Amino acid sequence: MSPLWLLLGLLALTGSSESSSWGCYGNIRTLDTPGASCRIGRRYGLTYCGVRASERLAEVDRPYLLRHQPTMRLVGQKYCMDPAVIAGVLSRESPGGNYVVDLGNIGSGLGMVKETKFYPPTAWKSETWVSQKTQTLTSSIKEIKTRFPTWTADQHLRGGLCAYSKGPNFVRSNQDLNCDFCNDVLARAKYFKDHGF
């Protein structure tokens, strides 16, 4: 066997193992999720909901997100966050990849509601912007981890996603880990994980 083929084989093996073990906040491959609610599916013109809807919406965003995958990988390494989860969050927050929605402080729980703003997709090109989103998510996960130290890493991830979306006081028990944002993001993240993220 030629050394070149051996080297290429080793690179392929290390690349696949790297992408399957990303992140300090749970294993998205093992998480079960119902996916997007029917409300989310209808919002985007789908006649179905659940994992199928989340996967379809992720599929629509995938070509755009692929262009920014190096940024997500870099930020993922910096914050020990699976790039597939970052892609899932960005996909959920950017309908069809056409624009990014900023709903102000709705998720912060501070009671301040700002005017809805739409940013062009070029905002995603910024490593700083992706870092800010990821830092906010990891801070939410760490806060949940501090409040509920006996929970599993998967529960911390779910709680962090719900807190990221609904504010830190939304999660009061493990009954609050089934929010629509979390379910949809995890289904999209699993799709992205299976498609190279």
UniProtKB/Swiss-Prot annotation:
Keywords: Disulfide bond, Glycosidase, Hydrolase, Secreted, Signal. The active site is at residue 93. Its main location: secreted. GO terms for cellular component: extracellular region. Disulfide bonds join 24-80, 38-49. It is an enzyme of class 3 (hydrolase). It comes from the Eukaryota. InterPro entries: Glyco_hydro_23, Lysozyme-like_dom_sf. The keyword Manganese does not apply. Belongs to the glycosyl hydrolase 23 family. This is Lysozyme g-like protein 1.
